[in-house]
Regions:
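A residue-level marker of the well-folded mature domains of exported/periplasmic proteins
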Residues: 1-189
Length: 189
């Protein structure tokens, strides 16, 4: 189709990294909550998690982001029904926050991880309420293609060798959350 390369994140590789982080945190059973049915990328995030996580992963649709009350109630019910769940992975920022609220409602101490960035999510990471979020570095996903096209047109450069140029996964943790939040406020993260 004439594409030079793909600049982005492999959702499976990103999920793999999340699985390793849950292993490091000592989790044994994770609920991987999805906010859209049939979205292949979100499914790949959970499947990648399951590939590297040494415990059990339960993948469930938890309701749409548009109705966070229903979403949180669905997560509450899943957590109440299975007290062995000690980790929650949201495959987007809104559902990650819904998972945190559900755990808080039930008084459950879960290791919580997520995907993507919002100021509220980064704030919860900085506060220590969420362990991490996967950062696909969307700024790079916009910046790098423009740079690559410019270099191709003006200097006949190509990068990637026909393979994707990955922008993630990066991880936002309590160690770097304040800096990432500051960078997001100026529009580069």
């Amino acid at each position: 189709i004439g594409a030079l390369t793909h600049v982005g994140q492999s959702e499976v590789i990103a999920g793999n990294g999340a699985g390793q982080r849950f292993n490091d945190a000592g989790a044994t059973k994770i609920l991987c909550g999805q906010q859209e049915q049939g979205n292949v990328a979100l499914t790949e995030r959970c499947e990648g998690l399951a590939e590297t996580f040494s415990g059990e992963v339960v993948i469930e649709f938890m309701g749409l982001d548009a109705d966070t009350s229903e979403q949180q109630n669905t997560i509450n019910a899943a957590l109440a029904a299975d007290t062995d769940i000690d980790g929650f992975m949201g495959v987007g920022p809104v559902i990650t926050l819904s998972g945190l609220r559900a755990a808080q409602d039930l008084g459950r101490d879960l290791t919580i991880g997520g995907f993507d960035l919002t100021p509220e999510l980064i704030g919860e990471i900085e506060a220590g309420n969420i362990a991490f979020t996967v950062d696909q570095q969307q700024y790079l996903q916009g910046y790098m293609p423009v740079l690559l096209l410019f270099l191709n047109v003006t200097n006949q450069n190509t990068l990637g060798g026909g393979l994707p140029i990955l922008t993630g996964p990066g991880f936002v943790t309590p160690d770097n959350a304040a800096e990432i939040l500051a960078l997001s406020e100026v529009g580069t993260r």
